Amino acid sequence: MLKSCFKKYTYAQEKACSPIETIERALKKLNQTEKPILKEILRIDDLDRIGIPVYLCKVEEGISKRLGVGDSFGKGITPEQAEASALMELVERYSNFSFLLNANPLVDSYINLKGNTIPMEALLASLHSVFRENSFIEKLKNIKLRWVEAYDLIESKKVIFPLYWFYRIYGTTGWAAGNTLEEATLQALCEIIERHCISTIMEERLEVPTIEIDSIENPLIKDSLKKILSSGIEVFIKDFSLDLGVSTVAIIAYDPLAPTLSLRVYGAAGTHPNPNMALIRAITELVQHRAQVLYREFILNKPGGPTFCFLKFKDLEDAKFLLNGEKIPFNHLSSFSHPDFKVEIEYILDKLLKKGLKAYLVETTHPVLGISSVMVNIPGARLNRPSTKLHPYLLIARQLMDIGYYKEAFFYIEKAFEEAPSYKKLPQILSQAATCAKLAGEYKKSMEYYENLLEIYPQLMGSSKFVNEFISIVESVFADFNFKA
C-alpha cells in the first residue's frame, strides 16, 4: 500500500512538496466541493508577543454543524508553513469526519465474521488492565460493531477493523492529511507516539531527563528558542522518548507575565525519528497552543486549557516532577533520518513491534478533495483522555447506541452502573444514560437520570435545550402511565 516517497522540502520540516504548493492545492480543492468548506483564514499570532506564526482556518457554519468539524489551527517556523499546516488540518478533519459519516461499514459481531479481523484482545488493549479479562473479551465477541477495511502496517496485509470502536476511545489521535499517503502516515504515527509518551509520563508522573539547552546546535532551533526566551518565558526541554527508540521532545514553559493563568505553566511536545524535527514540532506546538488559548479566552470568551494529554499546572511546584531528572546533551537522543518517508515509517514500525504494538491504517482520502488523508490506530497506545478509563460496558453501550440498538445499549449502561456506581456521579455519563433510556422507551429511568443529573449539575436549568428535553421526558412518563392505566 505504501510506496517509496522522497522528501522534496526540508526547511524546518520534511514534506513531499513546498508549503506554497500545499497552500495552492489545498485552497483550490477546498473550493471545489458542492458547498464551501473554508470561511476564512487568519494569522492570529499577533495576539501573542513571541513572533512565531500561527494560522486559523474558520469553517463554514453549515459544514461545522453537519460534520462536527471545528476551526483548525496551523503552526510552523515560516508563515507559509503555518498557513499550510492550518489548511491541511482542515482537510484532515473534513476528510475523516466525512468518512465516518459515509463509510457504509459492515455491521456484525466478531463471532459471525469469517474475514481477516484483528484479535479481539486488541479492542481492550487501550483500557485499564482490569478490563482486559477474558469475560469482557467473550462478551465483546457477540456485540455488533462497525467494521471497515484497514491495512496492517506491520504485516502488510488488509484486515477488517472496528474503526468506530477505536474512534470512541482515541478520538482524532492518529488522524493526518499530507501531500502524499506516506507523508500523512508518518505524521499520524508520530502523533500517536507523541501522545502515548506524554500520557505515560503525566499519568505516572515520571521523572525524565532534562536536555541541556546549550547543547542544541541547530541554528533554526536556537533562533526560535531565542524568540521565546527573549519574551520573558523560561523553558525546560525534556526527553519524553521513554524506551520506544523514537525521539519525543517536550518543552515545559513558565511565563511569569502570562496574560492568562492558562499559560502560566504548560507543556508541548513533538515526535519524529529525527530529534531536530521533534524539537521544532514541540516549539511550534508550544507557540500554537498559546495562540489558541488567547484566541479562545480573549476573542471567543471561552475557557482555555492545557495542551492535549498534558496535566493542568497552576504553578511550577505543580510541575516539579517534570523539572527534575538527569541532564543530558541533545545529541544523546536516538536519531534516524532518511530521505524516503517509507523508510522512516518502517523504522518506526520496527520500534513499535519490539514493544508488542501494531499499527493499522485506514485511508480516508475524500473523493472530491483528493488530498491524502488517513486514520492510524495503534491498539495499546496510551492516551490521557477520559475515554481510555471507561468501563468496557459503557463503550459497548456507545457502540450500540450509534447503530440504533437502544435497548441493548441501555442494558450495558445499567450493568456498568451496577459494577461501578461512581459513574452515576459523572454528568456526561448520566446524560448519555438518560438519552439512551429515553430512546429505549424507558421513560421513568430516563427521568430518574435527568433528575440525578440536575442534582449534580444544577446549572443545566439555564439551558433551554435541557429544560425542553426534561419536559419531554416528563410528558412521556405521564403518557405512558395513562396508556397503561
Where are these regions (language model features)?
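Helix-biased "structured C-terminal domain" signature
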Residues: 1-485
